């Protein structure tokens, strides 16, 4: 078994939650998302993010708008929808429960 693969799978499992959480703070440009996820060591390959953003958009959890750029092509800025806020709230409850359960299991002697 390869530890790197397991670590990647663990990150992928919570990536959607983290992306929604970042977007919930306010409108965000894709490169800002990538930067924060990279700094937090949550994303290794940028190509992982774009399909996820498309899935979130299709599920109506996020929306985006195009903004003209003074240097280059227009930029796509993402924001969370009301449906996305409700979804994120449920994920936050699930995350808290998972952390509690994992802590309980991993701190037993």
Predicted regions: what they are:
Residues 49-51, 55-56:
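Basic amphipathic alpha-helical segments that dock to polyanions
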Residues 60:
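Glycine-centered, phosphate/nucleic-acid-interacting loop/turn motifs that mediate DNA/RNA or nucleotide
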Residues 64-69:
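Conserved catalytic-core motifs of GNAT/GCN5-like acyltransferases
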Residues 70, 74-92:
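Basic, amphipathic "hinge/linker" alpha-helix immediately C-terminal to the N-terminal HTH DNA-binding motif
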